[in-house]
Amino acid sequence: MRLLDSKGVHAVFEQLHAANPQPQGELHWRNTFTLLVAVLLSAQATDKSVNKATAALFDVADTPQAMLALGEERLCSYIRTINLYPTKARRIIALSAELIERFAAQVPCDAHALESLPGVGHKTANVVLNMGFGIPTIAVDTHILRTAPRIGLSSGRTPRAVERDLLVVTPREFRMHAHHWILLHGRYTCTARRPRCTECCLRDLCCKNNI
């Protein structure tokens, strides 16, 4: 596997920045609690399907207290179009109760505390810290796990390994948005089956590993 040198890495992020100066996540949310819920719901589901369900849900429950009052059964009625909704509903009710009991109904700005909540893993915690609190974490999803090694930004084979590589090689000035740049690039350009190399802003920089 070929990897980019530091000059090449910087050029990659310069191009991604030029193409999309202010990348945005595609999940809809209103506060850090609704962000946490939306990210939890997005596991093995599309952002579009989550947004469709949460548009109505967040009108009636956008705080831990309101979600707990809604209850698991009624929550299921809002999210039943989302994959694994019974398990996700159970976890959302449980984490709402824990947020009230342990964190004064506030979403904690701490990775360890976030990962102690029901259903919240390392990737979810990183997304919430980045999008909700402006911390330059890099959450590695399936798109980033595929795309970062293709480009030559990482030789990792697991999400944690790719995350470690990206935190090392990504220039500080690009770290805040690195997650979204690579994710969106993988979702819309460097796709799994038919990467759109001829249309790619990185075509002259990319290592094209495993393509």
Curated annotation (Swiss-Prot):
It is an enzyme of class 4 (lyase). Its EC number is 4.2.99.18. Transmembrane segments: none annotated. Gene3D superfamilies: Helix-hairpin-Helix base-excision DNA repair enzymes (C-terminal), Hypothetical protein, domain 2. Pfam families: EndIII_4Fe-2S (PF10576), HhH-GPD (PF00730). PROSITE patterns: ENDONUCLEASE_III_1, ENDONUCLEASE_III_2. The keyword Transferase does not apply. The keyword Metal-binding applies. One of its GO terms (molecular function) is 4 iron, 4 sulfur cluster binding. Binds 1 [4Fe-4S] cluster. GO terms for biological process: base-excision repair, AP site formation. InterPro entries: DNA_glycosylase (IPR011257), Endonuclease-III-like_CS2 (IPR004036), Endonuclease3_FeS-loop_motif (IPR003651), Endouclease-III_FeS-bd_BS (IPR004035), HhH-GPD_domain (IPR003265), HhH_base_excis_C (IPR023170), Nth (IPR005759). It comes from the Bacteria. Signal peptide: none annotated. [4Fe-4S] cluster binds at C190, C197, C200, C206. It catalyses: 2'-deoxyribonucleotide-(2'-deoxyribose 5'-phosphate)-2'-deoxyribonucleotide-DNA = a 3'-end 2'-deoxyribonucleotide-(2,3-dehydro-2,3-deoxyribose 5'-phosphate)-DNA + a 5'-end 5'-phospho-2'-deoxyribonucleoside-DNA + H(+). CDD domains: ENDO3c. Residues 111-130 form the HhH domain. Keywords: 4Fe-4S, DNA damage, DNA repair, DNA-binding, Glycosidase, Hydrolase, Iron, Iron-sulfur, Lyase, Metal-binding. Its cofactor is [4Fe-4S] cluster. DNA repair enzyme that has both DNA N-glycosylase activity and AP-lyase activity. The DNA N-glycosylase activity releases various damaged pyrimidines from DNA by cleaving the N-glycosidic bond, leaving an AP (apurinic/apyrimidinic) site. The AP-lyase activity cleaves the phosphodiester bond 3' to the AP site by a beta-elimination, leaving a 3'-terminal unsaturated sugar and a product with a terminal 5'-phosphate. Belongs to the Nth/MutY family. This is Endonuclease III.
